Amino acid sequence: MGRSLKKGPFADAHLLKKIDAQSDSDKKSVIKTWSRRSTIFPSFIGYTIAVYDGRKHVPVYIQDDMVGHKLGEFVPTRTFHGHGTDDKKTK
């Protein structure tokens, strides 16, 4: 179930403030955030945002096809190590 259209998209205020501060300055550095729940806006395009996955910050370069998605969708939190092997053949 998606978010109601009358509410509009959500992004944390501190993340928007960091994006605005970088758009005013000429240098583009990596923006660290813990806000996986924030929706990607068109003003985020071209920036690299380091999203926290529970262990480290993973850099994500924002492209125009990512607009409307959440930041957390592009950074997995779990690592799959494969299913257990069948040890019956070795015995």
Curated annotation (Swiss-Prot):
GO BP field: ribosomal small subunit assembly; translation
GO cellular component term of the entry, any: small ribosomal subunit
Domain of life: Bacteria
A Pfam family of this chain: Ribosomal_S19
InterPro entries (alphabetical): Ribosomal_uS19, Ribosomal_uS19_bac-type, Ribosomal_uS19_CS, Ribosomal_uS19_SF
Any GO MF annotation of the entry: structural constituent of ribosome
Keyword line: Ribonucleoprotein, Ribosomal protein, RNA-binding, rRNA-binding
Role this protein plays: Protein S19 forms a complex with S13 that binds strongly to the 16S ribosomal RNA.
Family according to the record: Belongs to the universal ribosomal protein uS19 family.
HAMAP family: Ribosomal_uS19 (MF_00531)
Name by which UniProt lists this protein: Small ribosomal subunit protein uS19
